[in-house]
């Protein structure tokens, strides 16, 4: 119920025809710009702290700019950057505005390659200087680079040490700056390699420049750059000479999809936005595979290249549960299955009392799982009806039949979010009091003192909104019991691959487990896990073990959930409260192709993830006890 931030969305477009083609067919040479806007707006869910775009012209004379960028901060950043681009054209006559040759020759952003980025910060760093794309400029066109990405690296310190060891001096200690310098350095080396080949061919002047731009191999650049990256990433780039690329991590943690026809090549973080923007069937859209790069040459020739050996695929399951748009055909089915998988545990919790239970959902992102839950409950109730009717024999009483057939799953819109109030109370001392009114409730939607209330959510991470708002406001309806149902398992571990949840103390599941250890006189387990974690410092990250698992090991999921209820239920709550979680196996059955579950299981796909959780636990203990 609390909003999770996740690192970013990307969009990349390469026009495969001259600008005149789009002016003639679509009535505007700005076809690429317009499609980029649509791709970014349709992925607005992936980033609301800032946005940026970059463009490269393939044809520009020396002395003319060919690489352009716009960036802005805030939730309205997409609109702002495109308005700023359009401001370059406001004084043009209608004839000039529809003259593709004139635009190509004289106007900024009248190019053939485009790249867009939506930002959510998961590192705590903010400001316009951290908004992608980043630029690295040079007098050689081929050495210019625009870079953006959806990523988090766990080994920034190692990469920083590596590039400073060869004499580079990054201006900031931030992962994107460091990666820009690293990829830029490898791009420089590749240009110099091809330069030497051109000289060996006897070429001079512009002949060398043209040779470089025709023979540069971005696969070499990416292979030598990315071999030491540890993290989840989709990195996109444009070079000044007109090449485009996107590379995905070997574990497939972060998502990317692409499409090509005779007019355009496009890549985005989410599949349905490509379907919507270009009106193409899902079958025509391809997934960029783990460790693979999409490479587009200056001439517009597209190819994929296996840059890094693919590892066991660990695609982020939170993308399916919460982050990605639910309009994707597979995500929609998976979220419905997540709701359906919860049905046995829900029935057990309510003691099969469907006649006195009302079902609803909070927030809207849980709506699809809610439909799946209802479908599963309907199936169960129909089976029960069949058995009851069969028990009546060959000559059933009509009244008895009517009673059986009249039974329905009771679903209601119990809570409605007040968007304006949510914005208003973002800060201030009275936040907690006002937070209780973020949701309005539908009075009369259940029978007070008689009915149970089941509310499904997509995830419970910190539990803040539950404690400050949800439980208290639902209790006003007078339910006998409140069941908070999560379509995802207990979030127990930090994420280091792009989700804004990096501190152990944030997780209500972790806090509950620690409280149980204290209550049961098992604090030695905390000390032991700390000591083992501390002893690992200095080991190669590949040898490290996630000892935080020992904090949870003594307890069942149900014991931890029960303690969470104690911690989250506000004083004065009249209804009994229970939390029901999705079992881990239920998640895997619902999303079989998205096995990345480290925030639930502690099984990190990369060594860097284990190193980071180790340090997070050490930090938690040392801050708590002021070591």
What are these regions (language model features)?
Residues 1-289, 295-358, 362-363:
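Conserved short alpha-helical segments that host acidic/polar catalytic motifs at enzyme active sites
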Residues 162, 166, 182-186, 228, ...:
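Generic, well-ordered alpha-helical scaffold segments in large soluble proteins
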Residues 226, 241-243, 248, 260, ...:
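PRPP-dependent phosphoribosyltransferase catalytic core
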Residues 237, 248-249, 269-271, 298, ...:
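Active-site proximal loops enriched in glycine and acidic residues that flank catalytic Cys/His/Asp
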Residues 300-315, 361-398:
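Terminal amphipathic helices with adjacent charged low-complexity linkers/tails
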Residues 359, 366-373, 411, 421, ...:
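Extended, hydrophobic alpha-helical segments in both membrane/secreted and soluble proteins
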């Amino acid at each position: 119920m609390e909003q999770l931030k996740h690192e970013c969305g990307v969009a990349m477009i390469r026009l495969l025809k001259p600008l005149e083609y789009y002016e003639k067919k679509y009535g505007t040479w700005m076809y690429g710009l317009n499609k980029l806007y649509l791709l970014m707006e349709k992925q607005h869910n992936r980033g609301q702290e800032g946005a940026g775009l970059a463009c490269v012209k393939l044809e520009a004379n020396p002395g003319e700019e060919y690489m352009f960028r716009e960036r802005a901060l805030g939730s309205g950043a997409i609109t702002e950057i495109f308005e700023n681009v359009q401001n370059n054209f406001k004084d043009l006559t209608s004839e000039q505005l529809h003259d593709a040759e004139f635009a190509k020759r004289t106007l900024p952003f009248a190019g053939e390659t485009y790249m867009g980025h939506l930002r959510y910060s998961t590192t705590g760093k903010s400001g316009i200087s951290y908004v992608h794309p980043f630029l690295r400029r040079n007098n050689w066109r081929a050495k210019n680079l625009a870079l953006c990405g959806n990523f988090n690296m766990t080994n920034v310190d190692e990469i920083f040490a590596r590039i400073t060891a060869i004499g580079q001096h990054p201006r900031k200690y931030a992962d994107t700056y460091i990666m820009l310098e690293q990829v830029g350095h490898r791009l420089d080396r590749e240009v110099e390699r091809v330069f030497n080949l051109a000289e060996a061919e006897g070429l001079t002047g512009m002949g060398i420049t043209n040779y470089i731009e025709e023979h540069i191999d971005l696969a070499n650049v990416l292979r030598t750059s990315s071999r030491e990256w540890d993290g989840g990433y989709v990195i996109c780039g444009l070079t000044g000479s007109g090449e485009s690329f996107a590379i995905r991590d070997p574990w497939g943690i972060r998502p990317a999809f692409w499409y090509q026809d005779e007019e355009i090549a496009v890549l985005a973080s989410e599949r349905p936005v490509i379907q919507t923007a270009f009106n193409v069937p899902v079958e025509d859209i391809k997934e960029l595979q783990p460790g693979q790069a999409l490479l587009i040459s200056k001439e517009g020739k597209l190819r994929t290249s296996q840059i890094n050996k693919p590892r066991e695929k660990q695609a982020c399951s939170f993308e399916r549960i919460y982050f990605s748009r639910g309009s994707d055909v597979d995500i929609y089915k998976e979220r419905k299955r997540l709701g359906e998988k919860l049905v046995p545990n829900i029935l057990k919790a309510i003691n099969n009392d469907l006649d006195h239970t009302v079902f609803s959902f909070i927030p809207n992102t849980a709506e699809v799982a809610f439909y799946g839950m209802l479908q599963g409950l309907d199936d169960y109730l129909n089976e029960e009806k069949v058995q009851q009717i069969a028990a009546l024999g060959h000559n059933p009483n009509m009244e008895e039949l009517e009673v059986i057939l009249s039974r329905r799953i009771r679903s209601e819109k119990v809570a409605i979010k007040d968007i304006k109030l949510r914005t208003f109370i973002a800060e201030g001392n009275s936040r907690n009091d006002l937070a209780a009114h973020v949701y309005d409730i539908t009075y009369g939607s259940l029978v007070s003192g008689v009915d149970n209330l089941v509310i499904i959510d997509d995830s419970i991470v910190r539990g803040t909104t539950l404690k400050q708002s949800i439980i208290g406001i639902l209790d006003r309806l007078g339910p006998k019991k409140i069941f908070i149902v999560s379509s995802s398992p207990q979030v127990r571990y930090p994420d280091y691959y792009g989700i804004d949840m990096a501190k152990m103390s944030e997780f209500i599941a972790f806090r509950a487990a620690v409280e149980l250890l204290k209550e049961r006189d098992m604090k030695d387990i905390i000390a032991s896990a700390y000591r083992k974690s501390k002893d690992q410092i200095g080991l190669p990250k590949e040898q490290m073990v996630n000892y935080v698992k020992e904090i949870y090991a003594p307890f069942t999921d149900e014991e931890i959930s029960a303690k969470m209820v104690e911690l989250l239920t506000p004083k004065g709550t009249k209804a009994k409260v229970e939390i029901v979680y999705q079992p881990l196996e239920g998640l895997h059955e619902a999303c079989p192709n998205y096995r990345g579950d480290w925030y639930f299981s502690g099984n990190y796909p990369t060594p860097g993830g284990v190193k980071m959780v180790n340090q997070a636990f050490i930090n938690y203990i040392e801050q708590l006890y002021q070591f």
